[in-house]
Amino acid sequence: MTDLEANVLAAAQGKVGAAALPNLYSGYADMAYDLDLMGKVVDLAPYLTAKEKAAYVDGFLSEGDLMNNGELKIFPVAKSTELLYLNATDWAPFAAATGVTYDNLATMEGVVEVARQYYDWTDAMTSTPNDGKAFFGRDALANYLLCGAQEMGLTIFDTKNGVMTLHFDKDVIRKLWDNFYVPYIKGWFGASGRFRSDDVKTGNLLAYVGSSASSPFFPAQVMTSDAESHAIEPAILPCPSFAGCSPVAAQQGAGMIVTKGTDAQIRACVEFLKWFTQPENNIAFSVNSGYLPVTHAAANLNAIQASGLELTDIVTQVLDLSLDAVEHDALYTTHAFLEGPRPASPCKMP
């Protein structure tokens, strides 16, 4: 729990010494759910017309429907999804030697096979047996499990009105296992630093799936020792999905929560949020902070480029791929439930 969440919760509980509960604050679904159980959260659905709701990306609004009953308890302001980041410089000699291409990284099954080939290719560089290098990792393991299961038609945490039903199909879970844990155990996948971009920087990985908001952290060089390093260029690719399945994109990012107050206070918060998510305002805020706008009009690369913001080539690639994912892929995030999962954290395997 962050300091912000702890302070808001203390205010909601009326603890001695706590500040007054704010009218509006930034938070995730789990925190909104906890406050909603206390009767502190405003349903914003009645304050928006059908036309106003239609302006927002559907999946972003649905996250705020905590109980799946048509309410809106979290207002979207900026979001992110996941992409595949690749060290294109060190990929080049591997690709030339083995014939693999970026197309092989479109599916999880393809990533596993490429990782196997990379391990064997690097293993053959020395006379020491079984010293091949890992190819791939993920920042958020939970996203792989939940979105991967969703692609295969399984909702692991199926929530309705705050009540969760657990679905754990053996075949689906086995496929998730075979395409992550098995290659990890074999040394084809890896995780050692706090984030997978750290592992790329140290040369321990060549590729990883991470947040679209994390592109500024992709390293400019690989440091193979305290005295040796070389510059690298990134390649940004779509997040791999399972073969034969329609892609499901993770949606991430805090939203705005309005707490109960006077009618004037609530309406003021709603008007601010509507203004804040108007395309020109939302583009400036979201893109400058590394996130994606939340309306259809703003979540458009042409609109962003026309806004006058200076975009690097990498940022343009990230936006292009991310916006395509949120507009065309199914978006998924877990709905909150009692003692449910908190926002995805970096994956560090034991």
Can you name each region flagged by the protein language model?
Residues 112-119, 159-193:
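Glycine-centered hinge/linker elements that transmit conformational signals in sensory
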Residues 67-77, 82, 109-165:
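Extracytoplasmic/periplasmic solute-binding protein
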Residues 45-58, 93, 100-106, 129, ...:
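Short, solvent-exposed loop/beta-turn-alpha elements that line the ligand-binding surface or hinge
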Residues 1-37, 50-53, 243, 267, ...:
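Conserved N-terminal structural module of periplasmic/extracytoplasmic solute-binding proteins
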Residues 13, 70, 186, 225-298:
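Extracytoplasmic/periplasmic substrate-recognition and gating elements
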Residues 250, 313-350:
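C-terminal capping/gating helix-and-loop segments adjacent to ligand/active sites or protein-protein/ligand interfaces
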